[in-house]
Amino acid sequence: MCGISAFLCHPGKASSNEQANAQTRHVVDELEHSLDLVGHRGPDARGHIDILTIGLGHVRLSIIDLSLSGNQPFHDQDNSIHAVVNGELYDHEYYRDQLASEFQFVGTSDCEIVIALYKHYGLSFISHLRGEFAFVLWDANRQLLIAARDRYGIKSLYYTVVQGKLLVATEIKSFLAFGLQPEWCVRTLRDQSWRIESRTFFKGVHRVLPGHYLISRPNEREEQKPYWDLEYPDKLSHDARSEEEIVQGVRKRLLEAVKIRLKADVPVAIYLSGGIDSSSVAGMVADLMRQGTKLGNESNSVPSNMKCFTVQFDEDSGADESAIARRTANWLGVDIHLVKMDEEALASRFEDAVWHSEIPLPDLNGMGRLALAEAVHAQGIKVVITGEGSDEHFAGYDAFRADLLSEPDHSWPALQLPETDRQKALAMAAKQVKYGIFGEYSETVPDATKRMLNHSHVTSTIARVGSLPFSNWTTSYGNDLPETSLIEGFDGRVRDNITKRWHPLHTAQYLFTKSFMPHFILRYNGDNIDMVNQVESRCPFLDHHLTEYVNNVPPSLKLKYLPEEKSFREKYILREAVKPYVTDEIYNISKKAYMGPRKFWPGGPLHRKIKQLVTKENVESLGFVDWNATQEAVEKAFTKQDPMGLRRTITVAQFIVLGKRFGVKPAGALPN
């Protein structure tokens, strides 16, 4: 786990080598400063290489191969191919054996296989990488830069062009060192296309999308292409497997995904909440240890050596799960550390969580995650295993129920409701999803947009989360609805699959996995926040060997109707797969969204923080937010404990933090 920064100069065809060298020498100083801005990500080592028009920089958090041979950048034996890598690659030992005769490995770092695979497979090598990763590779012979990001966007990777230089980095803040002067992109803010597309809400700043790679050459425009995407079966096809066969298939793949993530030359711990996702991971780790699997660098494989960390919110906050987590830990016989998170602790971390996540999320769970990582770091632990990604793949959100019921599940007809009952249940679920977890819904979505989405019920929930009270002048940028931007952000192949081939539940899962998960959840409850305290998070539920199997599980086995209870059981197939590893309490517990506290009173620590940030001057310094509407939201949030008002208030406050720390000038109207 590390931080990377890179540049590729576009000197112009008329530039001499001398001019190019002079430009590069200046940019190298900027590269070093860009590494300073993400220095928290890699305190163990630092390195860079610069050759004419290219520079690659790296700060390292040592996890595997703690020796100097694991330091980066990496190079091939001809010194013509160079790479900087952030993340963990879990099949590195297999590929080392396979490629030992044709590549001279220097050390035992997992990330060293990137160059070896590139030399063996060419550009197709990215598909052979298994894990959480982002990297930049430079092939001097071909004058080719390649930057890529893992399949689900666990690691962040951004790019932009500043003063004739292509810049690529783990975090946007690194671009400030190269002279980036951020400006708000009002169009992407209004239509919220930044939630799905490569474009961010900063003009000219793009993300490498999950499952994509970027290629560029000197004096040529960069180009982004996909190397992987989620696939689902045809909704009319029948699944001939038995339920038990599918249960065993999920269990086998999840166990393997957990097991390979226990390897490290440093201590490894578990993030444990009160839900089935992290509890099943903890249960599997404990079971693997009993069978002799090492947990990180632990010498004794006994569960009592395993450490779990849990946020403990105030008991009356409605968000505390520590009592359940404690019971799970006691049942497993493992150590548990409760990290107390009261309102004062939450408010004190508000601005730092926004700055490091570089994204506004209308919730406060990122501050709890920041406190967790602080506690893990204080214990000398560098790696944690987490539960992110389960809800999206096993249908854990209540909002999925309406889409499950939108059409019969022809792949698993044995579980079908009678048609009359299905229609009644659909009407109720469709009504509930309007006022679901985020409380955002639009009745004005055009019919054409609805058809492109095959009338998915989760669209507004995803597209409008954290919507802003925009100033009236921003309509000059158009009135595209977020729902339209969401579906038009996908290519024609995906839209065709949605309208013709995929079951609506799979469409809903695709939408969540491509938007809310990588751009919100994994930024606020993942790498960006954990690495503030030099903690690497690993996500077994996002192992593509597992998810490609789960994506082919019939919808009715993910969200199963239980006729004897006249209710639905979310994540049914996961519950059955992990039943041997969790308590009866966890097996039977209903899904509860992992969110921070949602009710705060006037005069409290958070209210004081909001009053400090959300002033008339600060709101007007954004340029695109209406002050009167913001005042109204703040009033509702704290005097009426209105959840919509709180979400809107938090979102505005987070944009204010980003604007101030990035030095963004106020947005203005389009010129006449």
From Swiss-Prot:
Which pathway features in its UniProt record?
Pigment biosynthesis
This entry carries the following GO cellular component terms, namely: cytosol
Q: Which domain of life is it from?
A: Eukaryota
Which PROSITE patterns does this entry report, sorted A to Z? GATASE_TYPE_2
What EC number is given for this enzyme? Answer: 3.-.-.-
Keyword Chaperone appears in the UniProt entry: no
Which GO molecular function entries does the Swiss-Prot or TrEMBL record give? asparagine synthase (glutamine-hydrolyzing) activity; ATP binding; hydrolase activity
* Deletion phenotype: Leads to a depletion of most chrysogine-related metabolites with accumulation of only 2-(2-aminopropanamido)benzoic acid, 2-(2-(2-carboxyacetamido)propanamido)benzoic acid and 2-(2-((4-amino-1-carboxy-4-oxobutyl)amino)propanamido)benzoic acid.
Q: What protein name does the entry list?
A: Amidase chyE
